[in-house]
Amino acid sequence: VQTPGGTRGTLTELEGVDVYAYPHNETSTGVSAPVRRFGRAPEALTVVDATSAAGGIDFDVSETDVYYFAPQKNFAGDGGLWFALMSPAAIERAYAVAGSGRYIPPFLSLTAAV
């Protein structure tokens, strides 16, 4: 999705897409997007990067499968930390990917964090 600076793009639901990922808020312009579920297919996950929105913009957690952020912005926390709210479907997908034989570096192992 491409848009001019300072505007919000719109995701389009497409057949065969299994993850819709987008930022809740664009840091440099402050443009925010509503947190809402995309995709009608039951396996389609909605993943939201909330690094510059967490704690500052209300949202309905049931509208996303993964809402993740690093606390160094809105929470003035140390860098290098990462938090995520994950639905059961997202956790199940993480384990499925980990069990698929795909190489995942240990420092990127989501299942190690769960």
Task: Put a short name on every predicted segment.
Residues 3-51:
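Active-site phosphate-binding strand-loop segment of PLP-dependent enzymes
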Residues 16-18, 65, 80-82:
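A generic secondary-structure signal marking the coil-to-beta-strand transition
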Residues 22-26, 48-51, 70-72, 79, ...:
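Fold-independent oxyanion-binding glycine-rich loops
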Residues 29, 33, 52, 59, ...:
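Flexible, active-site-adjacent loop/turn segments at secondary-structure boundaries
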Residues 31-35, 56-62, 78-82, 93-97:
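A short secondary-structure junction signal
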Residues 40-45, 60, 91-93:
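Secondary-structure boundary elements
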Residues 61-72:
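Conserved active-site segment immediately N-terminal to the catalytic lysine
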Residues 72-114:
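Active-site C-terminal subdomain of aminotransferase-like
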